[in-house]
């Protein structure tokens, strides 16, 4: 029985306008579009009246938008029939938790009503264009009436196995299958398979060919990096991979794992890892070695086809790599990067942005940068990993490179996803897989998506059918991955009792690659049952079940002895799992299929020796010739400094990147010390990202990026050397110490096979693997390659192509001794007399080849910057380390893209100050000024105190780089950036002017992607020369610990009592599936003297936990159930409509000796429990931000007079706080309701601007809530809800900016201590 229920409007006015604009662009005759959600319920019996009411309430969620009377062309978009969407599985879980057992399944679609101009009829092609706008054809279907939606719940018989008949068709049958299935097998691999299956005496099955193709794709096996090379007739001694490994052979210090796992591991620091005791669920610090894992991946092919899911699953896959390192570890902080062709922003196309065309199967660079960053950010946000580092480059030009004149660029983009994490020392190495061990799939179900992704990504774009390209893109479900990570966390937290023996993530090739890899790496074979694979698409054929790349999955080996422990953890975390197979002694792979158990031809889809699949497959031999890049001498004779400055600041590579940053959570974990945003004006110019090792430590980790890819169009080796060097100049402002405490990841992107590029790749690898890194004492223990960076197509009968430069992206990971000493580019105006010093590591060279200056004038140049002397680079790094540790440097910024001009202006932007720069000692006259200001030779600029000059000179001299240093200027208070030479001003404009030019890219992209009203408001702020920036005003003593006596009293009592009779007040740190901010919340309450206890909603619903045992309740932030029924609403309804849970919560709220706090998702959840929270009648509903975008900001708030027990004594204080939410807009039912809330005295916190005024203006008010309302309390003050995150900034070092005078505790600790004081 299927029931249809009409839902709320699905699109805001802004989204409708955006859709209409897209229709207009496609010349579709569309006047208007109205869309609303449509819910479909499959019931196993009729609902009662009360159940019907619960279901209706469950499916009423989100913001209040005016309903329309539907009319026009009807299009119903639903998940693809035969599949179960993530929305369906989560909402169905909520329904069951609400007691709706008769609901077999919920599903959701969107009903579109399209009004056409003058009742026009759409042509077939126009219909196809409209359909493409409205749905994702890989995941969704379009129907023309509601009746057709019944097929959503239809199931069909599974597809059958297919044999490839080589017995009668010979090798040609394999050749044909290779083409039809898109396997991307080379001729020698086809021969290999033919020989082996002939020996086995049978025909191969399609599932076996798919599996072989994925496991042996370039993506998975890195054949080019393992190839043997002959260059210009000379056989080379080493493969590319051996040259990379050379760095580890020469310098293995501090490396614990390299080249053999999902990520590399280096030695970290000691600290207190904070997590709950596995037996008692009481949080506590565990002092131990905290080793650092590091990984950087790319997801280029999927991002070119479908940017949002491509980038999302790129981040998700890299996170899984980290979590599956050793026998389980913890991802901590992420990075994201993009290289694309010319952006060509509508109505903002730049003079250098020629349109060279593109094939229809890929999207534009503009589309990639609109959708891709959102996908990467959304996954990190929902998983709960801060993204604190990134890069963005655009390049597309016809240049005279190694193959003569041709178009070089990034039609096949680079989508970089990486990060660092932590792992226990005893978990770095994987354990033995014992014979008979359970081989488990943990995570989401199989779906028919991402088929052939490994093979597809190994081909140059244009070599496969468009349908196969699209089929190879995966789709994301980050909340599922979060659940899986919680399982992994609970396993590693068991220490020696960790039940995981072996773990791999499921990535390219799906289970067909992961399970064979798991058993082969463990020296075992395996026998698997195909139908034990969790499957949401019954109709799939065997090869689709085994080889699809459904995301959020891991494969794990667990012994029988540990299986019960593992299962209990999975059940508590609601993480799906299944025992799919068993490990065998014989290294053989068998997959059975019980569905066809009676059919001998179909019941054993795979029966192969593992060495046929993963053994000595054919090796690649590369015989290549070197080429010379002609280049062109730069003609800049007509270029003015002023025009060059404007163009450089408008080049997306240099321009402001706020639009890529504020969409991503940068504060979750409470351990981020340095994100991209710098200083009181939150300007995105940080050189690196820094995290604390633990919540009780000043030790930490840092990571930085380096890449100079356009240089490779002229000099392969220089480009590679510069990438390594730039990663060092970017990380030099942190307190690392020895250079060998830094380890590198190398990501290589190359158009393999393109004339000159193969020899160039060898030259570049050799340049750093054999030469520069050994000279610096650096190791590259991890990396990845993508060897198909070329796009080909036919246009009007003409063959066209865009080929990327050889692109090496280096990520440096370092161990930080003291995170408090990190120096940023913010010029300080409050440090007395200071000067700026330029450090030039090239000793006066000003080579412009491959520079941004050349690019913005559509040129390339000839001679490029380079690392001319490794000793000078080493001396620079060591000198910086000495200066940073001695706190002699006030501000630091490296010189890179855009040269000295960009470095200085960005520092001025961060410090909101003018500067006077004298280039007399750097420039050789008027004809040299351009090169002086815009060359991209290695170096940096430091701000130092006049009083420290002699001491600093001594340090610079000690490290041999004093002669590389030049005094270049001072700060001014004129809001002017001025460059002079020999007493003459050569370039001058207001800081505000340059700041707004630099901001244009962000402003334009935000205007087209987000609510344009908000984008305009944020841009307007940049014109305010008087803006004081973030500031603080406290009405209490930040250093006073108001509960010190209580904590001492509790400690004495505890010492007198037995270990199991702790008297400290207990606070329930409540989480639901998808919540991700619970650990830092527990740490904040622990700091205030509470016993913080991990409580999952599954504990409440199962009766394992009772709120009667607690003094405090905290509902934490995140994405409960992936916010499928509105932010926090599904969580709330699972309480309201579950009789036992409702009673328990209601009783707790009514107890006068308790307090409750809800933050972010917990705030949204509690706001939906108003029916059972006394005194909350004036609370609003929290809905989508006005910007219609997830907002991660560091915002200023003011504490209001209110009854809140948490804000006692803090009234009138103004201070910054972390904000990270997509649905924080306080929606009241009417103006009268707003007045009632304001008059009730229950508003406890409001957003204010930098002048201290309550504001509704974006971005000071990140969600547009009326009267700046962002926190409320009950009339008795015992229950407080708030959207910002005080728990993430309770440590001063976790604040993106703070006054120098703050100590260990930020002012937000007072809030948690107030809770402790309330309990008494």
UniProtKB/Swiss-Prot annotation:
GO molecular function, one term: ATP binding
UniProt keyword terms in alphabetical order: ATP-binding, Cytoplasm, Glutamine amidotransferase, Ligase, Magnesium, Metal-binding, Nucleotide-binding, Purine biosynthesis
CDD domains: GATase1_FGAR_AT, PurL_repeat1, PurL_repeat2
UniProt superkingdom: Bacteria
Residues noted as binding Mg(2+) in the record, renumbered to the chain: 687, 726, 730, 894
GO cellular component: cytoplasm
GO terms (BP aspect): 'de novo' IMP biosynthetic process
Subcellular location: Cytoplasm
InterPro entries reported in the protein's UniProt record: Class_I_gatase-like (IPR029062), FGAR-AT_N (IPR040707), FGAR-AT_PurM_N-like (IPR055181), PurL_large (IPR010073), PurL_linker (IPR041609), PurM-like_C_dom (IPR010918), PurM-like_C_sf (IPR036676), PurM-like_N_sf (IPR036921)
Ranges of residues in domain Glutamine amidotransferase type-1: 1067-1320
Active site: 1160, 1285, 1287
Quaternary structure, from the entry: Monomer.
NCBIfam families, A to Z: FGAM_synt, PRK05297.1
Family of this protein: In the N-terminal section; belongs to the FGAMS family.
Protein name: Phosphoribosylformylglycinamidine synthase
Organism: Colwellia psychrerythraea (strain 34H / ATCC BAA-681) (Vibrio psychroerythus)
Gene name of this polypeptide: purL
């Amino acid at each position: 029985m299927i029931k249809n229920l009409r839902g709320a409007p699905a699109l805001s006015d802004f989204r409708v306008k955006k859709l209409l604009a897209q229709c207009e662009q496609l010349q579709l005759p569309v006047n208007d579009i109205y869309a609303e959600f449509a819910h479909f319920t499959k019931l196993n019996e009729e609902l009662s009246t009360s159940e019907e009411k619960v279901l209706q309430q469950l499916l009423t969620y989100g913001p209040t938008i005016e309903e329309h009377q539907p009319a026009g062309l009807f299009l119903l978009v639903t998940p693809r029939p035969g599949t179960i969407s993530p929305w369906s599985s989560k909402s169905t879980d909520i329904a069951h938790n609400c007691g709706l057992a008769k609901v077999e399944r919920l599903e959701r679609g969107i009903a579109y009503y399209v009004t056409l101009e003058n009742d026009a009829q759409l042509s077939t092609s126009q219909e196809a264009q409209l359909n493409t706008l409205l749905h994702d054809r890989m995941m969704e279907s379009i129907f023309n009436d509601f009746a057709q939606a019944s097929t959503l719940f239809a199931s069909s018989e599974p597809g059958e196995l297919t044999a490839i008949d080589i017995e009668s068709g010979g090798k040609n049958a394999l050749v044909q299958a290779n083409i039809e299935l898109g396997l991307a097998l080379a001729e020698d691999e086809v021969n290999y398979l033919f020989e082996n299956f002939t020996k086995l005496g049978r025909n191969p099955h399609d599932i076996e060919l798919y599996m072989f193709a994925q496991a042996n794709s370039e993506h998975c096996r890195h054949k080019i990096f393992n190839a043997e090379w002959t260059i210009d007739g000379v056989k080379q001694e080493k493969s590319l991979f051996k040259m990379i490994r050379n760095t580890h052979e020469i310098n293995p210090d501090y490396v614990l794992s390299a080249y053999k796992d999902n990520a590399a591991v280096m030695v970290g620091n000691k600290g207190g890892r904070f997590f709950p005791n596995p037996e008692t669920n009481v949080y506590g610090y565990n002092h131990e070695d905290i080793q650092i894992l590091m990984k950087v991946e790319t997801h280029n092919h999927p991002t070119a086809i479908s940017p949002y899911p491509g980038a999302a699953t790129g981040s998700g896959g890299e996170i899984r790599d980290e979590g599956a390192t050793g026998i389980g570890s913890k991802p901590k902080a992420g990075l994201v990067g993009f290289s694309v062709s010319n952006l060509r922003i509508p109505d903002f196309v730049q003079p250098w942005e020629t349109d060279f065309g593109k094939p229809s199967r890929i999207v534009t660079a503009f589309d990639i940068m609109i959708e891709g960053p959102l996908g990467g950010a959304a996954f990190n946000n929902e998983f709960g990993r801060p993204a604190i580092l990134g890069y963005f480059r655009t390049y597309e030009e016809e240049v005279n490179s190694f193959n003569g004149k041709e178009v070089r660029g990034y039609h096949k983009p680079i989508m970089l996803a990486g990060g660092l994490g932590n792992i226990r020392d005893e978990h770095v190495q994987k354990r033995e897989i014992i014979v008979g061990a359970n081989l488990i799939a943990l995570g989401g179900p199989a779906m028919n998506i991402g088929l052939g992704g490994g093979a597809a990504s190994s081909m140059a774009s244009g070599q496969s059918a468009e349908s196969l390209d699209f089929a190879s893109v995966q789709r994301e479900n980050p909340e599922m991955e979060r659940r899986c990570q919680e399982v992994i966390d609970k396993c590693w937290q068991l220490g020696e009792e960790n039940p995981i023996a072996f773990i791999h993530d499921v990535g390219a090739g799906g289970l067909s690659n992961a399970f064979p890899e798991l058993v082969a790496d463990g020296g075992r074979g395996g026998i698997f049952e195909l139908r034990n694979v969790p499957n949401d698409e019954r109709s799939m054929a065997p090869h689709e079940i085994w080889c699809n790349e459904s995301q959020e999955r891991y494969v794990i080996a667990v012994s029988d002895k540990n299986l019960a422990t593992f299962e209990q953890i999975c059940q508590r975390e609601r993480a799906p799992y299944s025992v799919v197979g068993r490990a065998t002694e014989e290294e053989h792979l068998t997959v059975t299929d019980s569905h066809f158990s009676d059919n001998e031809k179909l019941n054993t889809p795979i029966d192969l020796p593992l060495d046929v699949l993963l053994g000595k497959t054919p090796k690649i031999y590369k015989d290549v010739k070197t080429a010379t890049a002609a280049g062109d001498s730069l003609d800049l004779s007509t270029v003015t400094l002023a025009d060059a400055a404007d163009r450089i600041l408008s080049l997306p590579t240099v321009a402001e990147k706020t639009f890529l940053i504020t969409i991503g959570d940068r504060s979750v974990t409470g351990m981020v010390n340095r994100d991209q945003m710098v200083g009181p004006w939150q300007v995105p110019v940080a050189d690196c990202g820094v995290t604390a090792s633990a919540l009780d430590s000043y030790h930490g980790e840092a990571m930085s990026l380096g890449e100079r890819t356009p240089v490779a169009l002229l000099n392969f080796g220089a480009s590679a050397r510069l990438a390594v060097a730039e990663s060092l100049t970017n990380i030099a402002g942190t307190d690392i110490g020895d250079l060998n405490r830094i380890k590198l990841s190398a990501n290589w992107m190359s158009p393999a096979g393109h004339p000159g590029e193969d020899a160039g790749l060898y030259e570049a690898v050799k340049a750093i693997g054999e030469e520069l890194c050994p000279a610096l004492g650096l190791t590259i223990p991890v990396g990845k390659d993508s060897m198909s960076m070329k796009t080909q197509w036919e246009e009007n009968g003409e063959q066209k192509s865009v080929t990327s430069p050889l692109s090496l992206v280096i990520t440096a990971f370092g161990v930080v001794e003291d995170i408090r000493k990190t120096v940023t580019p913010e010029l300080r105006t409050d440090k007395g007399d200071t000067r700026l010093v330029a450090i030039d590591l090239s000793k006066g060279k000003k080579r412009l080849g491959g520079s941004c200056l050349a690019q913005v004038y559509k040129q390339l140049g000839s001679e490029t910057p380079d690392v001319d002397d490794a000793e000078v680079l080493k001396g620079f790094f060591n000198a910086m380390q000495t200066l940073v540790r001695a706190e002699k440097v006030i501000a630091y910024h490296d010189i890179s893209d855009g040269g000295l001009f960009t470095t200085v202006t960005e520092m001025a932007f961060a410090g909101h100050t003018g500067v006077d720069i004298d280039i007399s000692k750097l420039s050789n006259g008027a004809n040299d000024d351009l090169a002086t200001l815009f060359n991209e030779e290695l170096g940096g600029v430091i701000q130092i105190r006049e009083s420290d000059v002699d001491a600093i000179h001594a340090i610079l001299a000690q490290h041999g780089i004093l002669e590389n240093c030049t005094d270049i200027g001072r700060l001014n208070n004129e809001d002017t950036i001025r460059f002079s030479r020999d007493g003459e001003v050569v370039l001058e404009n207001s800081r505000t002017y340059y700041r707004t030019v630099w901001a244009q890219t962000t402003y334009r992209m935000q205007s087209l992607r987000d609510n344009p009203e908000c984008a305009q408001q944020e841009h307007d702020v940049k014109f305010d020369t008087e803006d004081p920036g973030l500031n603080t005003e406290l009405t209490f003593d930040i250093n006073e610990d108001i509960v010190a006596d209580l904590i001492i009293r509790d400690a004495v009592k505890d010492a007198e009592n037995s270990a199991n009779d702790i008297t400290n007040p207990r606070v329930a740190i409540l989480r639901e599936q998808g919540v991700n901010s619970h650990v830092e919340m527990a740490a904040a309450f622990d700091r205030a003297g509470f016993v913080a206890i991990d409580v999952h909603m599954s504990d409440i619903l199962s009766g394992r936990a009772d709120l009667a045992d607690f003094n405090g309740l905290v509902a934490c932030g995140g994405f409960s159930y992936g916010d499928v029924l509105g932010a926090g609403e599904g969580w709330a309804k699972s309480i309201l409509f579950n009789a036992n849970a409702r009673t328990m919560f209601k009783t707790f709220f009514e107890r006068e000796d308790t307090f409750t706090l809800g933050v972010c998702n917990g705030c949204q959840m509690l706001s939906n429990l108003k029916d059972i929270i006394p005194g909350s009648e004036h609370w609003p509903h929290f809905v989508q931000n006005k910007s219609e975008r997830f907002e991660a900001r560091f915002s200023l708030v003011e504490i209001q007079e209110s009854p809140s027990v948490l804000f006692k004594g803090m009234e009138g204080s103004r201070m910054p706080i972390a904000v990270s939410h997509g649905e924080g807009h306080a929606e009241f039912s009417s103006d009268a309701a707003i007045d009632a809330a304001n008059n009730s005295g229950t508003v406890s916190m409001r957003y204010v601007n930098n002048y201290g005024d309550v504001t509704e203006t974006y971005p000071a008010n990140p969600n547009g809530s009326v009267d700046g309302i962002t926190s409320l309390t009950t009339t008795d003050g015992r229950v407080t809800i708030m959207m910002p995150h005080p728990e993430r900034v309770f440590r001063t070092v976790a604040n993106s900016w703070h006054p120098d005078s703050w100590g260990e505790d930020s002012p937000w600790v007072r809030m948690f201590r107030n809770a402790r004081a309330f309990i008494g």
